[in-house]
């Protein structure tokens, strides 16, 4: 377990002064965000959350507003914080650094380790890091919050107080007796938002190690890292694979398996989303970097690269355009097909792009970078999230157990 650290020595300002200044700035920032200039973006978010009944509790409204302030991207790519700082020439360097640091908040489900003066020492069950946390409302904000309980909260750093964090927005407290439900929610959050896990550098390396081992097992089971199957057979084969993996794990830990039912062995572990289940074929690729991904109608695309004369047919042409356009699809499937069919790739793209001089070896990477800049703008991350020791214990009902959670985000092109 590591300690979360941000910033450097806070110099002449005391911690109390910094927290008080945070409270002042946050109040001004909220008022700025709720002004008419941002109404066209904030109001629809609140209305969507309220639903047709137009009911929204105060805590949820605060969370939505806080997320909007810190992380929502406006049309020009900036955040509300960016615009607030840009319009306030009266802010000194520390104020600016502090506000800009809030654009990278820590969302998590935290176990309360202990109280320490006005602070709580929290263990984030998602990234397995400890955070020394204050509230700008003072010690009173933590009244009724007890050791061993849990908080669902968002934290922002207190610049430049080393390793000091502040509650941002609403927080929800859950007693120790809620551990089972909390563990389930934390596992779901870790799986659906692996970037929260990877705030911890140790989890990144552990994730790569786990993904490499899982990919090796996948290749051994299927005989390769790429499959093209009908949807029903995809589910059947993947469930057989996961069952095989669970049985191998159980066989290696007979002391833990003896005398109790093994979770997941009697139930399907994998089910395709509806968008994929309606496809004619599913491409399954377990890449060394991009991890395990699923692609709708991949068989049709493979036919196109095998026979470039099909480029003139609208279904094939539309599908390739979709693969190039969609942000849910990485460059991986197009790279794979171009590499597998070097003798036809040039012809396919020349006809699609209407560029007779196009050569995949010279222009392919440039094309992908132009169509999918978001992919190249981010560091590669493992497709497997490694759950921390404490969350593993809670999920196992108090028994020490190491968990890995596969992140399987299917590439799902919209049907042309």
Language-model regions, residue ranges each:
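A structured, charge-rich N-terminal accessory region that forms the first stable segment of a protein
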Residues: 1-91
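Short, charged beta-strand/loop "edge" motif centered at a coil->beta-strand transition
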Residues: 92-101
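Structural detector for short beta-strands of small beta-barrel domains
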Residues: 100-117
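Short aromatic-glycine-enriched beta-strand elements
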Residues: 118-123
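A short macromolecule-binding patch
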Residues: 129-137
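Short nucleic-acid-contacting surface segments enriched for D/E, G, S/T with interspersed K/R
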Residues: 136-154
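Mixed-charge (acidic/basic) macromolecular-recognition segments
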Residues: 150-332
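Extended, amphipathic alpha-helical scaffolds
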Residues: 269, 273-416
């Amino acid at each position: 377990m590591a300690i979360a650290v941000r910033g450097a020595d806070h110099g002449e300002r005391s911690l109390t002064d910094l927290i008080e200044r945070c409270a002042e700035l946050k109040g001004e920032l909220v008022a700025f965000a709720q002004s008419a200039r941002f109404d066209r973006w904030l109001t629809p978010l609140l209305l969507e959350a309220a639903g047709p009944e137009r009911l929204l509790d105060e805590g949820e409204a605060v969370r939505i507003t806080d997320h909007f302030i810190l992380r929502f991207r406006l049309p020009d790519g900036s955040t509300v914080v960016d615009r607030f700082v840009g319009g306030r020439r009266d802010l000194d360097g520390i104020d600016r650094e502090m506000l800009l640091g809030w654009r990278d908040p820590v969302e998590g489900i935290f176990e309360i380790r202990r109280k320490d003066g006005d602070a709580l020492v929290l263990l984030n069950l998602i990234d397995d890091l400890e955070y020394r946390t204050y509230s700008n409302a003072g010690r009173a904000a933590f009244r009724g919050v007890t050791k061993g309980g849990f908080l669902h909260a968002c934290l922002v750093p207190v610049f430049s107080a080393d390793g000091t964090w502040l509650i941002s927005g609403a927080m929800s407290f859950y007693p120790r007796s809620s551990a089972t439900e909390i563990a389930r929610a934390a596992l779901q959050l870790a799986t659906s938002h692996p970037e929260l896990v990877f705030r911890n550098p140790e989890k990144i390396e552990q994730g790569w190690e786990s993904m490499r081992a899982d990919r090796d097992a996948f290749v051994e089971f299927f005989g390769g890292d790429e499959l093209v199957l009908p949807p029903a057979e995809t589910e059947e084969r993947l469930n057989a694979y996961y069952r095989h993996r669970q049985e191998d794990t159980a066989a290696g830990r007979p002391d833990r398996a003896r005398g109790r039912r093994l979770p997941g062995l009697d139930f399907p572990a994998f089910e395709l989303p509806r968008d994929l289940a309606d496809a004619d074929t599913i491409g399954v690729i377990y890449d060394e970097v991009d991890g395990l991904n699923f692609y709708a109608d991949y068989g049709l695309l493979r036919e196109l690269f095998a026979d470039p004369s099909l480029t003139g047919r609208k279904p094939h042409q539309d599908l390739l355009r979709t693969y190039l356009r969609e942000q849910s699809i990485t460059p991986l499937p197009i790279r794979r097909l171009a590499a597998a069919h070097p003798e036809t790739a040039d012809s396919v793209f020349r006809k699609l792009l209407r560029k007779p001089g196009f050569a995949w070896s010279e222009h392919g990477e440039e094309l992908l970078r132009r169509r999918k800049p978001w992919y190249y703008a981010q560091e590669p991350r493992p497709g497997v999230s490694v759950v921390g020791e404490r969350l593993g214990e809670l999920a196992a009902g108090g028994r020490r157990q190491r968990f890995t959670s596969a992140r399987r985000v299917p590439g799902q092109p919209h049907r042309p």
